[in-house]
Structure formats: structure tokens, C-alpha cells
């Protein structure tokens, strides 16, 4: 193991969309906690919001209650509503002052990477090779994002989604259980990005890992630490203490297997608090993760340049 692309600074994100009581108020509380730890961004998905407002609406409520942490709702558009979704995400980017992203969801398992790219990054292949917002397709200039386009997040775990990630993602998430697998897919994604004319250094690849930190302060339970977390039907799971999780994060990043982690707390309040005050604090103490936000936008948190307009399309998309 040891990617030929090397490694940059560590990036950390957390999901705050697990099933908890309390609605958007709890989401605000969790986002503030993540911000206290200087995490790059939080994700908000349907699991949190049902039967309440959707992920975009919840994120819009969180935006004025936070000042730095990135906000990434899961956005699933059907064929008849991509313009509405783009406008809503652009509005979130505006009200959050550049902190918005969008996790490109798919309407169903039958949707392949090409359909994802065409449907959710609708302007790509429609006359603009950069995936930029088209003024003519938006309701007004006020709904266009102020930073080119919000950060795009794609789950690239499955092979068929990796082409879309290489073409248009700013952040690719991988649900993998060992560092060698993560390293191989990261290299594949970066090679793919370079192959379509992108700078591979403008793509962040994060391992998405469910975490259960209810088992003590230090050791991971058997099969959950060391070479990797345990595989489960819901994705890779780490179960143990915050200290051992910090060691796992540091080891994988040091080896160049990943640019960072998207951590999904099994019990949001308990696990996110232990993650921020335990795992993240230890990484900060060791100089492995930042202690403050040097910038104000999500692109700055991720070390990405301004949104580019050169992404190459293919396959008639």
C-alpha cells in the first residue's frame, strides 16, 4: 500500500442524519458540535428528516445557526425537477455564504453513473463542458451560487458510480473496510479524473465509516480496529473507543489510502460528542488535524480551488 499520489492534509466530516428525535433543532445542535471540532462538513440525509422537512430544508435551517462548517444535504432529483433542485442548492450556498455542497443521490438502484451525471449535473454535456450553472435555466440571478457551483459529493463505492465521480465529483465517498481497498479505489478515481482532463488534486476521496463509540475510551473491539473495521450489511463499522479510532484514522491517512473520513455516528448525540471531544481532539493535539477554520467556504476547508469550468464530458452526456 502507498498511493503514488501521496497525501495532503487530513479531512474529516460527519453525518448528522441518523434517526433521532427532535427534528431540525437536533440537527442544528449536532452541526454546531461538528463546527466546534472544525470538521470540514456535515451531511444531512433523508433518514434524519422523515417524516419532516427534506434534507435541503433542514440544511437551510442550520445555515444561519452556524458560521463555518460545510452543509451537504443528500439531494435526489427525479427527471422532471433538476432545475428546482439546482436552484434550491444554489440558494443554500448563497445563504450559507459558500458553505453548501450536494450529495448527488439517485432515484433508485437502477440508475447508473451516466444517468447520475446527466441528471444531477444537468448542465454538463448540455453545451457547457464545465458543469457551471446556466443563467438561462435558473429562475433568477439571485438563485445562482456565488462560488461557481457548490461542492459535489458522490458515493463511489460501487464500480459503476466511479466514472461519474471521476467526471464531476469534488468529494468521493467510499464505504470500504480496509486501507488497501481504499488506496486502490482512490488511485482509480484520481487516474480517472486525470483521464478526463481534471487535476486529480482537485478530488478528495474520503472513507465513509459507521462508528459506535459506546465501548470505552481506548481499544477497538475485536475485528473493528487494526487493519480495518468490520464489514456489515449497512457498511463498514468501527466499534470501540475514540483513541483507537484516532489511531485508525491517522494510520490510513499516513499510508496515503485516503484523504480523510466521513464518519457516521450510530448514536448521533453520544458518538458525535465522543468523536469531537475525543478522536478529533487527539488528532488536533498531535498536529494531524486543524484546530480552527483558516477559510470561510467549504471549498476552502477542503483545500479546493475555485469551481472550474473545464470538466470533460463523454458518452453523449
Give names to the regions the model predicted.
Residues 1-66, 147-150, 294-296, 313-317:
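N-terminal beta1-alpha1-beta2 module of alpha/beta enzyme domains
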Residues 110-122, 182-193, 268-289:
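C-terminal helical cap(s) of enzyme catalytic domains, especially alpha/beta-barrels
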Residues 14-25, 74-83, 106-108, 148-160, ...:
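Active-site mouth loops of central-metabolism enzymes
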Residues 2-3, 10, 81-168, 201, ...:
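Internal, glycine-rich beta/alpha segment that forms the wall or movable "lid"
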Amino acid at each position: 500500500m502507498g498511493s503514488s499520489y501521496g497525501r495532503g492534509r487530513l479531512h474529516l466530516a460527519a453525518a448528522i442524519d441518523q434517526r433521532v428525535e427532535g427534528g431540525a433543532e437536533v440537527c442544528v445542535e449536532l452541526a454546531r458540535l461538528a463546527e466546534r471540532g472544525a470538521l470540514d462538513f456535515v451531511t444531512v440525509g433523508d433518514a434524519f428528516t422523515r417524516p419532516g422537512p427534506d434534507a435541503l430544508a433542514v440544511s437551510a435551517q442550520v445555515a444561519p445557526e452556524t458560521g463555518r462548517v460545510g452543509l451537504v444535504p443528500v439531494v435526489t432529483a427525479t427527471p422532471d425537477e433538476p432545475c428546482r433542485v439546482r436552484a434550491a442548492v444554489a440558494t443554500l450556498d448563497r445563504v450559507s455564504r459558500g458553505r453548501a455542497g450536494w450529495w448527488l443521490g439517485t432515484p433508485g438502484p437502477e440508475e447508473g453513473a451516466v444517468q447520475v451525471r446527466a441528471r444531477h449535473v444537468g448542465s454538463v454535456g448540455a453545451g457547457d463542458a464545465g458543469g457551471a450553472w446556466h443563467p438561462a435555466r435558473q429562475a433568477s440571478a439571485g438563485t445562482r451560487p456565488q462560488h461557481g457551483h457548490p461542492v459535489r459529493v458522490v458515493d463511489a463505492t460501487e464500480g459503476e458510480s466511479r466514472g461519474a465521480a471521476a467526471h464531476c465529483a469534488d468529494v468521493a465517498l467510499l464505504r470500504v473496510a480496509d486501507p488497501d481497498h481504499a488506496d486502490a479505489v482512490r488511485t482509480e478515481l484520481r487516474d480517472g479524473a486525470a483521464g478526463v482532463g481534471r487535476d486529480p488534486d482537485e478530488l478528495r476521496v474520503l472513507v465513509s465509516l459507521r462508528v459506535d463509540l459506546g465501548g470505552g475510551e481506548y481499544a477497538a473491539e475485536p475485528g473493528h480496529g487494526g487493519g480495518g473495521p468490520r464489514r456489515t450489511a449497512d457498511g463498514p463499522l468501527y466499534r470501540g473507543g475514540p483513541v483507537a479510532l484516532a489511531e485508525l484514522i491517522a494510520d490510513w491517512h499516513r499510508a496515503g489510502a485516503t484523504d480523510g473520513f466521513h464518519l457516521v455516528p450510530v448514536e448521533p448525540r453520544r458518538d458525535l460528542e465522543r468523536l469531537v471531544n475525543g478522536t478529533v481532539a487527539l488528532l488536533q493535539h498531535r498536529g494531524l488535524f486543524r484546530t480552527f477554520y483558516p477559510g470561510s467556504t467549504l471549498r476552502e476547508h477542503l483545500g479546493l480551488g475555485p469551481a472550474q469550468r473545464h470538466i470533460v464530458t463523454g458518452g453523449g452526456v
